[in-house]
């Protein structure tokens, strides 16, 4: 599975430069964690590491519990993909790549709420059949770094309903962030 082969030298400190083209293609940003694997054939493999992805089944269970309580679509994401989803519309978003609008919202940190009065936001790059009119997004912070988000989306877009979802989203994001720190 060799898509690209580039020869690089290791410097005195043992560092290898990953070319900008490869970083851009694989969406590797400065400061992103990478796992390093070795094989018996002398290969060194780098893999993007997602702390939120490590939560796996736990994140899925948390999303299901939150969806049952709120009747909203609940998405738990890392910085690029929807890791866990529950509620109406789950199949459309689970495992999908996040839209640029959502990625930008995650990078802003904190909690962001959009209502039906504004333009609807697609959670993923894939076109959703019914765009949510209201979204509450809370960034998951772990050791001061933004690792992903908890997104609660509501079809009606009513501000009162979104205000009720906001503390639940913040609590979920804080809980998952603290869980990753351990």
Regions found by a protein language model. Give the residues of each.
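Short regulatory alpha-helical segment in sensory/regulatory domains of signaling proteins that mediates
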Residues: 63-74
């Amino acid at each position: 599975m060799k898509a690209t082969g580039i020869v690089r030298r290791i410097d005195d400190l043992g560092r290898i430069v990953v070319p900008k083209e490869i970083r851009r293609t694989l969406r590797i940003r400065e400061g992103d964690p990478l796992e390093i694997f070795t094989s018996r054939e002398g290969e060194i493999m780098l893999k993007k590491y997602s702390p939120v992805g490590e939560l796996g089944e736990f994140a899925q269970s948390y999303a299901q519990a939150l969806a049952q309580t709120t009747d909203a679509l609940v998405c738990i994401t890392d910085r690029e993909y929807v890791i866990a989803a529950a509620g109406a519309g789950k199949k459309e978003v689970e495992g999908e790549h996040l839209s640029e609008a959502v990625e930008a919202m995650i990078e802003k940190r904190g909690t962001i709420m959009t209502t039906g009065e504004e333009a609807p936001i697609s959670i993923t790059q894939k076109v959703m059949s019914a765009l949510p009119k209201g979204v509450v997004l809370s960034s998951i912070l772990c050791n001061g770094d933004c690792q992903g988000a908890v997104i609660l989306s509501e079809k009606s877009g009513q501000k009162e309903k979104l205000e009720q979802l906001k503390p639940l989203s913040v609590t979920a994001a804080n809980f998952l962030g603290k869980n990753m720190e351990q």
